[in-house]
């Protein structure tokens, strides 16, 4: 019996060693691939940027006419002038001013090209190297920085002068500083809060994501110092207590942001800075389903496998009445909480226009009997893809990690709940179906998500103990490249005239 036990222990140890080696190989492969892809992406982006500026849209495009116009005022020294049509604070224009004043001394480009360059630099240098790369080492088996650098909803705006790129860089950068603490805990938390505050100068709703970062900051320290366990309500109380006990070092930096934003609200009377009549907040609950639909679509390589689909089918079979009531509930939400903004139906320069006109809102059959089950499945994907990756806590024993910097980038039930709440708070009040609003909900969901090592089409009997994520991560990268290629082709080959615009118009996200 002793010999059998020894043999079994030896076999188990060999499997653990093999798994450990496979994980190391995956991490090394990921690093090598990301380093190799970056110069290729940089070269491709340079070509696309050249086509944007010299061929396709060598003039301010859609919202650029407002952004460029305001930046030109700053370049002329007219800092007190403001275009009342602009809805966001002036963060983008300060960056554009800085790029024009510095890079403009070295090259003879026109002002529009220089302003667009600020987003190219942000999207292909700052975003992958200074924001995603540090997070990658906390969850190296989950995502590739190169892949999130070509996330389609974000990539489209690398070549235009829009607020989304730097808004994303700064608020996700706030999370990066809070997790990686590169300057020591106190200085890093303050730097994180400052990044979060600066992000609100690009998009006001980023104040909500400041709250998400604060939750992550608190939970990563509370689970160590207070000892999270399997009693979830108890963990929430521990987090609140730890926040009160460490108010000055952990909470105060973000509380300053919330206080400043409250002052802004009282002064401005609205979240929207200008053109308030066209951006009135409401209760557009269907917007959450639009968001989950996009998340499901973009994350297909992450969750798609036979067992995942079978789990959804088995759930509907085992709980048919419950599933029917859920879908009926979604239909009721579609019926009573759908907002069709006039801009959506009037602007055929956005893919959202065609999605709504041809699919989502084409007729009652598609709207209710096709889209409701799709929304139901998207909700399942959003929730179930995360479930296996959430921290598991022992009923009694504390976790072995002693420092927050040694924790992986992983959800607990608290941060997972916070992400859902923050997503609701940022997308539901918006009356406009605008895919750009889903960038941050997707990014924050994706970077915490562990990728299943299960092969795409494997049946349970074919499963092995071999660990491997490279194939899925590679497919995810190629999936994004394919989507980007299609959207660029659509943009390049579909030019049409508007009576109210002097230049040709094109189609973007």
Curated annotation (Swiss-Prot):
Enzyme class label: transferase
Pfam families reported in the protein's UniProt record: DIE2_ALG10
Intrachain disulfide bonds: none
Catalysis: reaction(s): an alpha-D-Glc-(1->3)-alpha-D-Glc-(1->3)-alpha-D-Man-(1->2)-alpha-D-Man-(1->2)-alpha-D-Man-(1->3)-[alpha-D-Man-(1->2)-alpha-D-Man-(1->3)-[alpha-D-Man-(1->2)-alpha-D-Man-(1->6)]-alpha-D-Man-(1->6)]-beta-D-Man-(1->4)-beta-D-GlcNAc-(1->4)-alpha-D-GlcNAc-diphospho-di-trans,poly-cis-dolichol + a di-trans,poly-cis-dolichyl beta-D-glucosyl phosphate = a alpha-D-Glc-(1->2)-alpha-D-Glc-(1->3)-alpha-D-Glc-(1->3)-alpha-D-Man-(1->2)-alpha-D-Man-(1->2)-alpha-D-Man-(1->3)-[alpha-D-Man-(1->2)-alpha-D-Man-(1->3)-[alpha-D-Man-(1->2)-alpha-D-Man-(1->6)]-alpha-D-Man-(1->6)]-beta-D-Man-(1->4)-beta-D-GlcNAc-(1->4)-alpha-D-GlcNAc-diphospho-di-trans,poly-cis-dolichol + a di-trans,poly-cis-dolichyl phosphate + H(+)
Bilayer topology: Multi-pass membrane protein
Cellular component aspect of the GO annotation: endoplasmic reticulum; endoplasmic reticulum membrane
PANTHER family attached to this UniProt entry: ALPHA-1,2-GLUCOSYLTRANSFERASE ALG10, DOL-P-GLC:GLC(2)MAN(9)GLCNAC(2)-PP-DOL ALPHA-1,2-GLUCOSYLTRANSFERASE-RELATED
Its biological purpose: Dol-P-Glc:Glc(2)Man(9)GlcNAc(2)-PP-Dol alpha-1,2-glucosyltransferase that operates in the biosynthetic pathway of dolichol-linked oligosaccharides, the glycan precursors employed in protein asparagine (N)-glycosylation. The assembly of dolichol-linked oligosaccharides begins on the cytosolic side of the endoplasmic reticulum membrane and finishes in its lumen. The sequential addition of sugars to dolichol pyrophosphate produces dolichol-linked oligosaccharides containing fourteen sugars, including two GlcNAcs, nine mannoses and three glucoses.
Gene Ontology MF terms: dolichyl pyrophosphate Glc2Man9GlcNAc2 alpha-1,2-glucosyltransferase activity
Major place of residence: endoplasmic reticulum
UniProt organism field: Eremothecium gossypii (strain ATCC 10895 / CBS 109.51 / FGSC 9923 / NRRL Y-1056)
Localization of this protein: Endoplasmic reticulum membrane
Biological pathway: Protein modification; protein glycosylation
EC code: 2.4.1.256
Transmembrane domains' residue ranges: 27-47, 112-132, 134-154, 165-185, 197-217, 247-267, 285-305, 317-337, 379-399, 413-433, 439-459, 473-493
One Gene Ontology biological process: protein N-linked glycosylation
Keyword Transmembrane set for record: yes
Protein's UniProt name: Dol-P-Glc:Glc(2)Man(9)GlcNAc(2)-PP-Dol alpha-1,2-glucosyltransferase
Glycosylation sites: 53, 268
